[in-house]
Structures are given as C-alpha cells and as structure tokens.
Amino acid sequence: MAASEADIINFRWKKISIVMQSALNALNPVLSVGEQIHDVLKIHKGLIGSEASNRAKELLSLVDIEHNRLDSFPHQLSGGMKQRIVIAIALAIMPPIIIMDEPTTALDVIVEREIISKVIELRKKLGFTILFITHDLNLLLEFADRLAIMKDGEIVELDEVKNIQKGGKHPYTNKLIGSIPSASGVRQKGLLTKPDKLTFPKDPILEVRDLKKMFQSPGLFNKDKLLAVDKVSFKVFKGEIVGLVGESGSGKSTIAKLVTRLIRPSAGSIYLNGKNKKVTESRNVPLEYRKTVQMVFQDPFGSLNSIHTVYHHLARPLFRHKLKNQTEMFPYIVHLLEKVGLTPGNKFAKKFPHEMSGGERQRVAIARALSLDPQIIVADEPTSMLDVSIRMDVLEIFAKLRKENNLTVLFITHDLASARYLADRIIVLKNGSIVEENASEKLIQNPKKEYTKQLVTAASPGWLSSLGENFEKKEEYNDQ
C-alpha cells in the first residue's frame, strides 16, 4: 500500500479494526480499561471527558460488562472478559469491517461460545462484516456464512458453509471435516476407538487424596489467598487414560503441576504405586519420581529451547538420569522420534524448534517425555494450540502409546469432545473441585450435573441454533 502513516492511522479503527488472538497481550497492562478505550475515542473521534466516558460505558454495555470495570486493569479480568474488552475497543469507531484473528483460541469452550454468541448478536444489531480467522473448523461451521479453506498459503476451497457441510470439493477440506471431534451422537470409529471392555489392575498406579493448593494473591500488603484446588481426590490405574476437563480457572493445570511435583500442595497426599510420597513435607523431588511421571506442556514452542536442536532436548534427560551412553544415544533418539511419527528420525534430530510446525514440535515434546520410559504422562492441554487435523494426529499418538506400551495418561483439556475420543474416564472440574466423574461415554450421553450438561452442549454441533433468531445465518449472498 502506497499510503502515508497519517493515512494508515486514519484508516485504522475507522474503516477496519482487529481483535487479536491474545487479549492479554493486546491490552496495555499499566492502563485501565477506561483509559484504553478513551485513547481510541480521543484519537479518532476527538472525544474527551464526560463524552468519552459515556461512550465507553455504551461500549461496555454492548459486550455485557458492568460500567465499574472501566477502572479495572487487565490482570483483574478473566480471559473471557478481556476478550470482550478488546471487542468493545474494536467497535469503538463502528468500522464496517472487523478482523478477528483466533479470538477464542485461548478460551475454554463455554466462554468461547459466549463470546461467539455475543459477536453474532452485535453483527446483527450493528451490521458490520466479520473476517474470522481460526483453525477451529467446527466453530466456523456453526456461524459463518462463507468459508475459505487455506493450505500452504493458498485458498484451496471457497464456498458457502451449507455447501461445505454437505462435503467439500477439495480433499484437504474433507480431511479437516473428518477430523472434527464431537461430544454428541455416535462416537466415530478409528484408531482412537477404545475396546468395549477395559480391565485395569485392582491397585491404582496414581492416587490423589484431599489435594489442596492455595496461592498468595499478588501485592505486598495483600493477604488474600486464592484457593486453586480444593480437596480433590481421584485414582488412575495402570494403562488407563483419564481426562481432566474444566473451564479456565478450574484448577486442572494446577493439578497437573502438583502431580508432576513442579509445585508443592498446601495439603493432601499423592500416592505412586501405593507409596505415599509425602509431597507436603519434602521440597526435594527424587529423580526416580521425575523418571516415573513426565509432563507434556500446552505450548510446544515455549516448552522447547529455541537455541538447541531436537537431539539436545531428548539427550538431556537421558544424560541426567544416566540411561544411555554416547554411542547408544543417537540411535535411541531416532527411535523415539520415529515412534511419534517424525520420520526420518535422523533428519528431525538435527532440527531446531523454529524449523518445525506446531504439530511437529508437540511430537518432539511427547518424544522427550517418553525418553525416560515413564509409567505416567501428564498431558496439559497438548492439543489446544493445534489445528483440528493435527490435533487428531496427536491424540492418536497417545492412543497408540497406550496400546503399545500400556502407558498411563492424565489428559488435561477444556475440550470435552477431545477427552471423549481419547479418555476411558472423564473427571469434570469447576472452581478447584470435582463436579462429576464417570466413564467417558456414560458422562457424555447422560451427564448428571448442570455444569457437565453445559460443557456437553457447548462441545456439540448445533449449539448456536438453540440461541434464537438473533443468530440465524444469511440465506442469500450478493457477490458484488
């Protein structure tokens, strides 16, 4: 574009605005919500004082946020509330086009649905156009009018959603559609299909009893404490895959860190193979525990060091635990990489993280966790940052490892549909406590608690159609 900076500033927000993926990074942490909205209004509308304040209140009302939040700072808001604030700022000058770049990726499924419902309601009310960018095809099939499928930097298919739902014309489109998990209907067949009957040893490999974790609230003089995990108890058996499901702030990732002993609990006990590890009393974690329980983190780029090769990442734990000598190291690492689908392994061993896709990086993270031949892997949201086809590939790796190695997996996710396809049993968490626990299919088909019912509904196709006439799609298009 041959435009001056002044022209671009005039164009930005007035003609087109954007809602970024990470609301936390999009908002200035040292400015209040009101100050950030006022900045846009002052620059583009010349509004100051009471005029700006009144307009800011109107914008908060549009996204269902109380006016007193104008004095709040980003760190005082939930993820869903921060994203609503970013949407309010994008609407400040009422541009005809709003670009939404992965606006719900970091949000749990219930908050995601609330945000999308509000966006569609505002579109109907205010008449703006949305360019919605996401890797979540299932989400777009619910509310988009038209859909452009991209692969390797090119659009491979562009059509109305109602036509794509009947079957795409491009093989890649059909691959994406076939990879979409659902929390409703009959469970799809495939590698992830679990046996009709699974038998596990009588004694659990992992048992958590009355686990509790409290965090000190930030601030030098703030003596308040946040109860993240409240008397949680559950058992996991050898060869079992257990899904730990809940919204943001439910305590599931805190439990992952407690089980892997990355943090110490405030109270409670963890038993491994029937042995009480007395985690509340010991600060030092035995090497044997680290070898037995490994973790796969949510962000495959953040969990890998950008300056080291894949070989270094897998070799380091082997050196630390003295499991392989120098001559055994490289062949073993190649074997691990090929075990998780990275072939040829000798080629991937020499790569750096930035030379791989998100799915490949997550496979490396899984291979690293497998390097010590652990009995338990704690997978903390391992697929939340991956697109739907890669997500299913990663789930298949865990299913394959369980089948071949009798590996035990504690699978932590906010995606109930993914948990259904992988886990034998699902534990639902809310506000640090267990709400419901049952075999996966029983919990999906017949949830007992209201919160579980909300999760199932939010993860099922057709959730948007139940919200009323405000959310109807357009039936006709004008190509002009």
Question: How should each PLM-predicted stretch be described?
Answer:
Residues 92-96, 371-375:
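A short, proline-enriched helix->beta-strand linker immediately N-terminal to the Walker B motif
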Residues 85, 90-91, 364, 370:
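ABC ATPase C-loop
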Residues 140-142, 419-421:
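A short, surface-exposed alpha-helical micro-motif characterized by mixed small hydrophobic
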Residues 51-68, 328-347:
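Conserved ABC ATPase "signature" region
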Residues 260:
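Helix-to-loop junction immediately C-terminal to a conserved catalytic motif
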Residues 155-159, 167, 437-438:
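ABC ATPase "signature
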Residues 245-247:
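The feature captures the beta-strand-to-loop junction immediately N-terminal to the Walker
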